[in-house]
Amino acid sequence: MVYVSNKYLTMSEMKVNAQYILNYLSSNGWTKQAICGMLGNMQSESTINPGLWQNLDEGNTSLGFGLVQWTPASNYINWANSQGLPYKDMDSELKRIIWEVNNNAQWINLRDMTFKEYIKSTKTPRELAMIFLASYERPANPNQPERGDQAEYWYKNLSGGGGGGLQLAQFPMDIINISQGENGSFSHKGTLCIDFVGKTEKYPYYAPCDCTCVWRGDASAYLAWTSDKEVMCADGSVRYITWVNVHESPLPFDVGKKLKKGDLMGHTGIGGNVTGDHWHFNVIDGKEYQGWTKKPDSCLAGTELHIYDVFAVNNVEIINGNGYDWKTSDWQDGDGGDGDDDNDNNKTKDLITLLLSDALHGWKA
C-alpha cells in the first residue's frame, strides 16, 4: 500500500512511500544514494505524495502535480495518457522518471553530471540532493540545504538498497596523541600513515565499524581490515574502507575474524620494525586489500585517505592532533536495516524535518 491523495502526508506516511520508491528504483539499477537524494527533494516538493496538487489546488493543470511537482501538470498528465497509464498513480510517476532518464528529459546538466550518471552515483545523499535540486527541480530559490538533510535522513532510515544500517566510522582510540604524522621520516615519507601513542603501553583501540580481518602479516606485526559495509566518513562521504593496524605482538586475530563496531581490535605495541610502543595506522578507499606499496615500506597499496577525513573523533580526547582537521559528526548509526529501532529518538527530528519541508508552505517555482 502507498499513500496517494491531495493532502500533505505525515512522516509515517512519507516513510511508507519512500520505502516503496527505494525498492522500485533499486530494482531498476539506481543507487540508494541517488534515490535518497531525490527523496530529499520529493519531501520538499510533495511530501513524497504522488497525488498532491500544488497548493492543494486540485485539477489546476497549470500548476505543479505529483512526486516532483511537474509544472505545468499537463505535461506529465498528457504523457501518462499517451502511455495508457493512470496519472494519479505511484508506478506511473516512477515510470515517467525512468523515461526521463532514458530520454534525457527534464534534466539540465548544471552540476557536471548527467541524469544517467546521477542514478549510478555513490556520492553522498546530501551531495546528490543538491545536484538533483539544481539540475532537475531548478526552483527560484536554489538555497535549500534542508533537502540535503532530508536526503541523509532517508538514507539512514530506509532499509535495503545497499545502505541500511549505515555506521559512522569512529576513530578507534579514545585519545589522539600523534608521535609521527603524514609524510614523516623513515617509513612515513610520502605516505598518509600516522603513528599514535597511548596513555600507557599496550593501550587499547577498538573497531571503528563492523569489519573483517583480511590479512595477517606476522613478520611486520600487522593486521589489515575492511569494513563490512559502506560507512559514513567524518567528511560526509560514504564508502568502503580498508585499513591496517601495525605493531601489536603477538597478533590477536586470524584472517576471517569479524568484529562489531566498538569491539576491542588491538593495542599499541613494539612488534615488527619499531622504535617505542605505538600504533601505526593507515587507511585506503575501497574494500580490497592490495598489499603493501614501497613508500618506502609501510603504506597500503591503493588510494590512501587522510585518517582525519575518514574517522570521526566524537568523544575523543585530542592531546596532540598535529594541527590536522579532525572532525566530529552528528551522524547516528543506522538501525541495521529494519528502519525501526531509532523511531522514538527521531520523533522530534521527524517533526522538525517535516516543518522544514517547502510543501507545507507552498512551492517555489
Curated annotation (Swiss-Prot):
Coiled-coil spans are none
Cofactor binding note from Swiss-Prot or TrEMBL = Binds 1 zinc ion per subunit.
Q: Which UniProt keywords apply?
A: Antimicrobial, Bacteriolytic enzyme, Cell wall biogenesis/degradation, Degradation of host cell envelope components during virus entry, Degradation of host peptidoglycans during virus entry, Glycosidase, Hydrolase, Late protein, Metal-binding, Metalloprotease, Multifunctional enzyme, Protease, Viral genome ejection through host cell envelope, Viral penetration into host cytoplasm, Viral release from host cell, Viral short tail ejection system, Viral tail assembly, Virion, Virus entry into host cell, Zinc
Q: Region annotation Linker: residue ranges?
A: 160-165
Q: What is its EC number?
A: 3.2.1.-, 3.4.-.-
Q: Where in the cell is it found?
A: Virion
Identify one Pfam family in the record.
Phage_lysozyme2
Looking at the UniProt record for this protein, which Gene Ontology cellular component terms does it annotate, in alphabetical order? Answer: virus tail, tip
Gene for this chain:
13
Q: Which residues bind substrate?
A: E45, T71, Q106, E137, R138, P139, A140
Per its record, what are the GO molecular function terms?
Answer: hydrolase activity, acting on glycosyl bonds; metal ion binding; metallopeptidase activity
Q: Which cofactor does it need?
A: Zn(2+)
Keyword Protease among UniProt keywords: yes
Q: Which organism is it from?
A: Bacillus phage phi29
Q: Which residues bind Zn(2+)?
A: H188, D195, H280
* Active site annotation, chain numbering: E45 (for lysozyme-like glycosidase activity)
Q: Which family does it belong to?
A: In the N-terminal section; belongs to the glycosyl hydrolase 24 family. In the C-terminal section; belongs to the peptidase M23B family.
Q: What is this protein called?
A: Morphogenesis protein 1
User: Per the record, which residues fall in region Probable metalloendopeptidase?
Assistant: 166-365
